Amino acid sequence: MPKLKTRKAAAKRFRATGSGNKIFRRKAYKNHLLYHKSAERKRRRLSGLALVSEEDIKEVRLMLPYL
């Protein structure tokens, strides 16, 4: 049986925790068009990592078989 391929675009966007139970992602809307967003919004709501929701974990695991 051949090896499963990893979706490289997804591999750059998701990371697993040490135990592998949870998957992290970056928050959206912080790449461009930032001048009209307040510093508070960028710092508090858009910074840091977020967990992938339970509903989406199955799809992420299909894209990343060796995660």
UniProtKB/Swiss-Prot annotation:
It comes from the Bacteria. It holds the Pfam family Ribosomal_L35p. Keywords: Ribonucleoprotein, Ribosomal protein. GO terms for cellular component: cytosolic large ribosomal subunit. One of its GO terms (biological process) is translation. HAMAP family: Ribosomal_bL35 (MF_00514). NCBIfam families: rpmI_bact (TIGR00001). This is Large ribosomal subunit protein bL35. The gene is rpmI.
